[in-house]
Amino acid sequence: MATATIALQVNGQQGGGSEPAAAAAVVAAGDKWKPPQGTDSIKMENGQSTAAKLGLPPLTPEQQEALQKAKKYAMEQSIKSVLVKQTIAHQQQQLTNLQMAAVTMGFGDPLSPLQSMAAQRQRALAIMCRVYVGSIYYELGEDTIRQAFAPFGPIKSIDMSWDSVTMKHKGFAFVEYEVPEAAQLALEQMNSVMLGGRNIKVGRPSNIGQAQPIIDQLAEEARAFNRIYVASVHQDLSDDDIKSVFEAFGKIKSCTLARDPTTGKHKGYGFIEYEKAQSSQDAVSSMNLFDLGGQYLRVGKAVTPPMPLLTPATPGGLPPAAAVAAAAATAKITAQEAVAGAAVLGTLGTPGLVSPALTLAQPLGTLPQAVMAAQAPGVITGVTPARPPIPVTIPSVGVVNPILASPPTLGLLEPKKEKEEEELFPESERPEMLSEQEHMSISGSSARHMVMQKLLRKQESTVMVLRNMVDPKDIDDDLEGEVTEECGKFGAVNRVIIYQEKQGEEEDAEIIVKIFVEFSIASETHKAIQALNGRWFAGRKVVAEVYDQERFDNSDLSA
């Protein structure tokens, strides 16, 4: 079946204008396009023509769904573009205000020196966020490096040099973090660590020399604050949980986890400031590599002072929700203006799919296909579409101020939740809820114990793993559909993953097949396990078990 496309031309050049505006224009124009009247035929890309008198055929459900996704993607790109522009404008305004204040205080003409100093500090911060990793085993890939260095903080990028002849990397890489403290911890704790049978070398980039005076100045300024950096924080822990654990070492002035402005969830790291320097030293020496909820905390001294001027802030001091709403309105107006301009300057081809800018980029809000765990070699042969959307954000540059957006409130859900709790538990037998525990005043070892108990109350898994069901030679294109159809008898199947796991590095090593089935709710998972466990399939006795939800969500299929 031939695919219809929309071609947007501006001033005779295809794809003119900014990508978000053009994308929004194409989508909006596709809704308003009507077939021309009095035309004998419309020439398609494949050379065929269709009678205009008969009109265009209605869009299929798949095409309508694709169009809706394109609209959503175009709007998200427009909002993102507007937010970036607003952030840049706000930072420029802050710099201008600082310059004007310097003039008022009698510092002479500070424009050029101040701009130069700000640029030097930004370059120094960028260098401080990067570490060099050498002596990497040639069979190790970017995923393995990311997994090894991720506990120290969010990674912005990994740059590996590849040999175009051998198609293998050259044995070194550069890892860039969001904050300098993450890079400093990685430098201290990863040098000479065994990775892939080799002791890797971790150090600073070679161009750090020119920025060393600025780095020393930042470190000196940081000593005035008794701040520590905490990374690898469990996702289920809150600011108060971390504060209750760390206040055993002294009185805390502030404890804030950096949050994603889109989801409201913390990014796994934050900063704690004590009133006394000794408290911060004790916390670093005692809590580094402390096992909290199955994750080893990474704790170190902050190497930069708090710098709100270098932190991307919402325009005009607006709350994040208000800034996004303002950006959405701006993006909508931009899209309308783009449509109006396209109606005058551009010509439209046959309606159908969207421009290449929308088809080549992955739409926001889609879950990437699961990948195999780095420590367990294997091959994934089938993945069905996943259900929940994952928001995508642009990582900020420089030192991130952890005081960001707070999580969205769930006030509308509370009455329903309380009603369900009353039905499930009589008042005399009702367990103590987490919301009540969060307001308890605890510290020290008691705090650590309470936090661990909180983490033990995990969400039930919705994932079932089928073992000993098929041999690798029995895998074909129909297997995934057959499993989906069979498991659909027990509930809504979100996706099926067929995973082949090699039991060693040898070429003739045994390969076992695991089939992962994700349901919508945990009760459906248990229902399927009861029906399928011990059942015979093609002469093999199937083993059906619950699979750890956190492992599955992290694409770890090796258990």
Curated annotation (Swiss-Prot):
Gene Ontology MF term list: cadherin binding; DNA binding; identical protein binding; RNA binding
GO biological process, one term: regulation of alternative mRNA splicing, via spliceosome
Tissue distribution of the protein: Isoform 2 is expressed in colonic epithelium and colorectal epithelium cancer (at protein level). Isoform 6 is expressed in colorectal epithelial cancer but below detection level in colonic epithelium. Expressed in heart, brain, placenta, lung, liver, skeletal muscle, kidney, pancreas, spleen, thymus, prostate, testis, ovary, small intestine, colon and peripheral blood leukocytes.
Biased segments, Basic and acidic residues type: 427-437
Chain positions covered by the region annotation Disordered: 416-437
Modified residues (N6-acetyllysine): 251, 454
Region (Inhibits homodimerization): 1-516
Name by which UniProt lists this protein: Poly(U)-binding-splicing factor PUF60
Taxonomic placement: Eukaryota, Metazoa, Chordata, Craniata, Vertebrata
